[in-house]
């Protein structure tokens, strides 16, 4: 087969091997950093690409989609969220876009719990303290954190990841509140979870974990006004998308002890951090590693490759995020 594909970063071998077996040409961006928009355009424009496999940090905007040319048959995003792609423009041009849902659900939910515990029990702060040689022996007031067992857990977004995160609370005897446009009967049955409005959730929760997609309605969903509703003992966890939180407002809330702590996997202007964030002891930060387990990343690579190959062969990708392209005449 003579398929011609561009991949914006070297993926785990499980996915790369699938692409190389199915394609005549698989070009990979050679640097271990996100390519710029112009670098992506140069890699695809006039190159007669059949497929593009990109990452969540790649800016696949209108200009990039237009540069793909008439030969492009599909775009595969190595992520569950696809706000980095101008899906509307791809749909106009009849280009199916796929993502990798489901496979990273538990890895991301697990990381949210890791951040919750790290923030609640001040683990990173205590680790630094110990490494610095400041630990002089057990002390009754040293690094006291918050109880998790028996606390109130607020889950904002009860889709795949949010629901999995909530269900993992079962062993901690927590009261669970959730906020979502749709009712989640499984959470209500398994956890006696209560669906509430966002303000109620923020006021009553000891831990608030965000699991919403980034759409116009969720940008700065958590702003200064919403942070002011939270308990001064509460912690905010974000493993969704950075712009869901007004990061400058979060810095002020943490600095002024309006909330007790935060655990962040994502950032508003990733990879840049809001001024002052890195200097705070009451925030735990990791480098967008929600799906970063060996097996999860391998499965994501296989899923993205399989959908791209299917589309190039003329089949419908399993995880198409713009199925409306199949209501029109599109490239085959």
Predicted segment positions?
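Rossmann-like dinucleotide-binding domain for NAD(H)/NADP(H)
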Residues: 97, 233-332
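Rossmann-like dinucleotide/phosphate-binding beta-alpha-beta segment
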Residues: 21, 138-232
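An N-terminal-biased, well-structured beta-alpha scaffold segment characteristic
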Residues: 1-98, 223, 329
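Residue-level detector of alpha-helix initiation sites
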Residues: 59, 81-84, 99, 103-104, ...
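Phosphate-binding beta-alpha-beta segment of Rossmann-like dinucleotide-binding domains, i.e.
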Residues: 93, 101-152, 164-167, 317-323
């Amino acid at each position: 087969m003579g398929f011609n594909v561009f991949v914006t970063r070297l993926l785990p071998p499980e996915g790369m091997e699938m692409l190389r077996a199915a394609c005549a040409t698989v070009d990979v961006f050679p640097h271990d950093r996100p390519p710029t928009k112009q670098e992506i355009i140069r890699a695809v424009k006039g190159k007669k690409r059949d497929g593009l496999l990109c990452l969540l940090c790649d800016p696949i905007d209108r200009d990039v989609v237009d540069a793909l040319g008439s030969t492009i048959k599909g775009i595969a995003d190595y992520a569950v969220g696809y706000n980095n792609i101008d899906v509307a423009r791809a749909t106009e041009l009849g280009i199916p876009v796929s993502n990798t849902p489901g496979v990273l659900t538990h890895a991301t939910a697990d990381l949210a719990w890791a951040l919750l515990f790290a923030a609640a029990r001040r683990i990173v702060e205590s680790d630094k303290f110990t490494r610095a040689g400041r630990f002089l022996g057990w002390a009754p007031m040293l690094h006291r954190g918050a109880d998790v067992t028996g606390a109130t857990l607020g889950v904002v977004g009860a889709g795949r990841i949010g629901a999995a995160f909530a269900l993992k609370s079962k062993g901690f005897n927590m009261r669970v509140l959730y906020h979502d446009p749709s009712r989640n009967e499984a959470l209500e049955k398994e956890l006696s979870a209560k669906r509430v409005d966002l303000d109620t959730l923020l006021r009553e929760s000891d831990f608030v974990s965000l699991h919403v997609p980034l759409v116009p309605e969720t940008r700065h969903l958590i702003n200064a006004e919403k942070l002011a509703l939270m308990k001064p003992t509460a912690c905010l966890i974000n493993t969704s998308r950075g712009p869901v939180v007004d990061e400058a407002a979060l810095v002020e809330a943490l600095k002024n002890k309006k909330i007790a702590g935060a655990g962040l996997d994502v950032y508003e202007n990733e990879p840049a951090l809001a001024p002052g964030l890195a200097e705070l002891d009451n925030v735990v930060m990791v480098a967008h590693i929600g799906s970063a387990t060996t097996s999860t990343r391998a499965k994501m690579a296989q899923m993205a490759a399989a959908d791209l190959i299917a589309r190039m062969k003329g089949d419908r990708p399993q995880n198409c995020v713009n199925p409306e392209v199949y209501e029109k005449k599109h490239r085959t």
